[in-house]
Every structure is written in structure tokens, then in C-alpha cells.
Amino acid sequence: MIVLHARDCDPKACTALRAHRMGLVELTRHPGDVPTGAVVLDPTVEKALSREDRDAALERGLVAVDCSWEHVHRYFGPLRRRCRHRILPYLIAANPVNYGKPCKLSTVEALAAALYILGFRREAEEFISRFKWGPAFLELNRERLEAYRRAETSAEVVRVQEEFLPDGL
């Protein structure tokens, strides 16, 4: 797993930096370091992550981008043509900063969710358990994650997601 890191955050609170210090992810500041064909978690696209992305993630890598919304295009733009951009479906954050907020996942939560959806449940559990609040993320989202994991395609993930969306969202 790779994190493209913009250094926009408080280093003491940054889950991506903590994961890197623990040896759980590679860290880079340059979009050119991201392998061609990698699966990039991208909140600005419409195609949902699904098990059909599993082989690409295994062969080319799974990438999260840790940057402020002000710099989204600076980091996602250079990757647009050469990587698979996928959005995560509806999930609830359990990190201390955004606990209970929908779609406000930390970088570590996003990577754990992606692993789970791609079918790497045990690896997702091991990865997120390294963070004090990690098991809470899995428990809060267990039903959703299991349903997304069972979906074969992006279209199926989107259909399943509809069942979990609150009214008005």
C-alpha cells in the first residue's frame, strides 16, 4: 500500500504518517512514484471500488492520497490517465477527529475499508487493529463492509450502498 502524502496535516495526528512509521505503508510525495495501473482511492470519481479491482491492487498497488481538499487536483490530476481511480462506498468514520461522521474517513480507515472490500478481510483487520480506535471502525461498519465485499462489481457496490444511505443523502 502506498500513500501519496501532501504534508497538509498535523504530523502528530496524521494516520498515514503513523502507519508509515509502523512500516504498514510506503510514503511518497510525488505522483510520478505511483505505479501505472495502481488502484487509487479517489473521492472525486463515481466508479466504486469493488472486488473486480482486486487483481490490479495486488499487481500494481493500492494507493491513498492524503491531502487537503484545496490540493485535490494537484495530486489526483497527474494520476488520472495512468491509474484506476475508485471511490469508497458509504462508510462511517470511527477516528477520534470525525467519529460518527459519514464519509469522513482517515487515510488508514480508507485503506482498511479498501482491503476489506477487495476481499482481504483478515489483512484489513490486522492493519486497522494497530490503531486504538481501529476495531471500532470495523464494528461500526461491519454490515456495510460485508455487503460491499460480497458485491462483484462497482455497479453492485453502488446498488448495495443505496440500502445503507440515510434518507436525504
UniProtKB/Swiss-Prot annotation:
It is found in: Cytoplasm. GO terms for molecular function: 18S rRNA aminocarboxypropyltransferase activity; S-adenosyl-L-methionine binding. Its EC number is 2.5.1.157. The keyword DNA damage does not apply. It catalyses: an N(1)-methylpseudouridine in rRNA + S-adenosyl-L-methionine = N(1)-methyl-N(3)-[(3S)-3-amino-3-carboxypropyl]pseudouridine in rRNA + S-methyl-5'-thioadenosine + H(+). Keywords: Cytoplasm, Ribosome biogenesis, rRNA processing, S-adenosyl-L-methionine, Transferase. Its main location: cytoplasm. Pfam families: Ribo_biogen_C. The keyword Transferase applies. GO terms for biological process: enzyme-directed rRNA pseudouridine synthesis. S-adenosyl-L-methionine binds at residues 15, 65, 88, 107. Disulfide bonds: none annotated. One of its GO terms (cellular component) is cytoplasm. HAMAP family: TSR3. NCBIfam families: PRK02287.1. Aminocarboxypropyltransferase that catalyzes the aminocarboxypropyl transfer on pseudouridine corresponding to position 914 in M.jannaschii 16S rRNA. It constitutes the last step in biosynthesis of the hypermodified N1-methyl-N3-(3-amino-3-carboxypropyl) pseudouridine (m1acp3-Psi). Belongs to the TDD superfamily. TSR3 family. PANTHER family: 18S RRNA AMINOCARBOXYPROPYLTRANSFERASE (PTHR20426:SF0), RIBOSOME BIOGENESIS PROTEIN TSR3 HOMOLOG (PTHR20426). This is 16S rRNA aminocarboxypropyltransferase. It comes from Methanopyrus kandleri (strain AV19 / DSM 6324 / JCM 9639 / NBRC 100938).
